């Protein structure tokens, strides 16, 4: 009896061994991530640090790298005007906000970001300028008029509408786009309010390829602020690289603190169907500056309650490129007034949210099944699995080739069990578990059956990746527990993917281990 108990304890111990999870290894990789494996961070320079400057933000870029960020989108950096201090009311498109620093300071920020293999995108406001912008007096012909008077777009009293029927205005705006590439070596533009009826599709159709080709060897990316797939369909073929999955985010906002899974599945199916024939990527998020302040002035906790955790997992594993808004990693418990640059309280800690994000972003970087593509047909397939015994539980897989991820979410208000069928049985790695993630990142080997019963906490989540650990592979003839270390002298000549599976010569982008060394295939 004692011998049997000892064997049982040993077996249980072996099944719960925590192995190297590689989260920091992946996020801090010196390699630049390929398109399709990237995460974007929206930063308001004035809110991001107490100093509110480019220089102070530059000092924190290493922290963003460790979080898993690849692209820093800077909200408008131009001098503000118009009377209400909106960053989207620019006085001069070729100057920086003096409170943030100089163009040289911005360039230094970009240089440091590039050293960390991160990109910097600027917020571009093509539709209007501040009512007291320099052009109002120097080039009044750049503005649209009615009855001889300049026009406030959408009745926004702090800005004047620009006139894209004037070729001189078009040339001036394009010159501004080139200016920041020349002066600060920026990598892309997030373009505000591209659905404006005052900006013709032909403008984008001409400008985007021109700017992309402006500097030899330089890639410039364009993100358009619109749901092009559904609302701004006239812009489908003008060249934007990414749009906003607005309808999906609006659905999440309306979901709020709901506790059933059926609506989430419907949201997902609507998103996937609407994205099925697109030729550009999509950005998914649960909050940004508009949702956080303009639309509701509600924090993530106020808007979603404890749903903020599983909905984060849902949004960042379902489709597209993940966006995180500055401060979201602290739990998102501030409504940040970006008109007055409310400072983020970095002393507020939410280890559960932070470690969840770190893990999700590491998986985004390393796992092909979580990649995104501008060609809809090349995106990993999403398959919703049958769930019985708990209406609050949603389960789905994403699959690309032999790479597969399983996500299980419990949107319910009580801990419980649910039986999920349709799983590819065998070895899986549990990378993200809501019950333990607050204590730190981890990775655990487990075996799942085709029909598996899960015990999962209320508002809980788990993310599994198909495969086994190399250190638990019975065919491994070398101790390779520390394979990611460049100092490891392993002579094992086989290739292992990030989940520990032996693979043939790698063909899919990602992180591999070979002879004890990291190999990153772009």
Language model: regions and residue ranges:
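Sec-dependent N-terminal signal peptides
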Residues: 4-13
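Sec/Tat signal peptide C-region and signal peptidase I cleavage site
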Residues: 15-19
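Substrate-binding/active-site clefts of carbohydrate-active enzymes
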Residues: 21-71, 76-185, 199-202, 206-218, ...
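Active-site-proximal helices and loops of the catalytic beta/alpha 8
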Residues: 22-23, 176, 182, 190-285, ...
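Asparagine-centered strand-capping/turn motif at beta-strand->loop junctions
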Residues: 408-412
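C-terminal beta-strand-rich structural cap/linker in extracellular carbohydrate-active enzymes
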Residues: 444-475
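Residue-level detector of functionally pivotal "anchor" positions at catalytic/ligand-binding pockets or at interdomain
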Residues: 468-499
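C-terminal tail/sorting-segment detector
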Residues: 511-522
């Amino acid at each position: 009896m004692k011998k049997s108990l000892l064997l049982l304890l040993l077996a249980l111990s072996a099944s719960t061994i925590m192995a190297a999870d590689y989260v920091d290894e992946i996020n801090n990789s010196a390699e630049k991530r390929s398109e399709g494996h990237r995460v974007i961070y929206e930063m308001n320079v004035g809110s991001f640090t107490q100093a509110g400057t480019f220089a102070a933000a530059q000092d924190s870029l290493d922290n963003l790298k460790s979080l898993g960020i690849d692209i820093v989108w800077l909200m408008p950096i131009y001098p503000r005007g118009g009377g209400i201090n909106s960053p989207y009311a620019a006085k001069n498109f070729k100057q920086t906000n003096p409170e943030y620093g100089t163009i040289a300071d911005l360039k230094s920020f970009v240089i440091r970001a590039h050293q960390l293999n991160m990109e910097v995108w600027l917020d571009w406001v093509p539709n209007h300028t501040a009512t007291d912008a320099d052009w109002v007096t120097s080039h009044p012909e750049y503005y649209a008029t009615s009855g001889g008077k300049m026009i406030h777009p959408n009745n926004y009293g702090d800005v004047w509408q620009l006139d894209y029927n004037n070729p001189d205005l078009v040339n001036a705006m394009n010159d501004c786009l080139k200016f920041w590439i020349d002066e600060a070596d920026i990598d892309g533009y997030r373009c505000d309010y591209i659905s404006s009826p005052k900006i013709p599709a032909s403008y984008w159709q001409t400008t985007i390829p021109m700017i992309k080709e402006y500097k030899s060897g330089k890639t410039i990316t364009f993100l358009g602020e619109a749901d092009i797939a559904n609302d701004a369909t006239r812009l489908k073929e003008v060249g934007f690289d990414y749009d906003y999955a607005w309808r999906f985010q609006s659905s999440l906002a309306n979901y709020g603190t709901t506790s059933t899974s059926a609506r989430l599945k419907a949201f997902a199916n609507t998103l996937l169907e609407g994205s099925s024939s697109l030729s550009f990527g999509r950005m998914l998020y649960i909050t940004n500056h508009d949702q956080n302040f303009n639309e509701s002035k509600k924090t993530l906790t106020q808007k979603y309650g404890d749903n903020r955790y599983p909905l984060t997992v849902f949004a960042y594993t379902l489709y597209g490129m993940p966006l995180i808004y500055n401060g979201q990693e602290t739990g998102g418990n501030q409504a940040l007034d970006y008109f007055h640059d409310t400072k983020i309280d970095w002393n507020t800690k939410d280890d559960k949210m932070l470690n969840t994000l770190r893990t999700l972003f590491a998986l985004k970087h390393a796992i092909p099944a979580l990649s995104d593509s501008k060609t809809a047909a090349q995106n990993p397939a999403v398959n919703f699995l049958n769930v019985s015994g708990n209406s609050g539980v949603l389960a789905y897989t994403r699959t690309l080739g032999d790479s597969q991820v399983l996500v299980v979410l419990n949107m319910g208000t009580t801990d419980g069990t649910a039986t999920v069928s349709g799983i590819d049985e065998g070895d899986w790695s549990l990378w993200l578990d809501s019950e333990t993630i607050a204590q730190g990142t981890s990775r655990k080997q487990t075996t799942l059956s085709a029909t598996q019963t899960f015990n999962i906490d209320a508002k809980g989540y788990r993310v599994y990746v198909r495969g086994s650990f190399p250190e638990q592979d019975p065919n491994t003839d070398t101790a390779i527990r520390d394979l990611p270390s460049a100092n490891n002298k392993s002579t094992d000549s086989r290739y292992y993917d990030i989940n520990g599976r032996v693979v043939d010569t790698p063909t899919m982008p990602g992180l591999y281990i070979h002879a004890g060394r990291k190999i990153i295939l772009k």
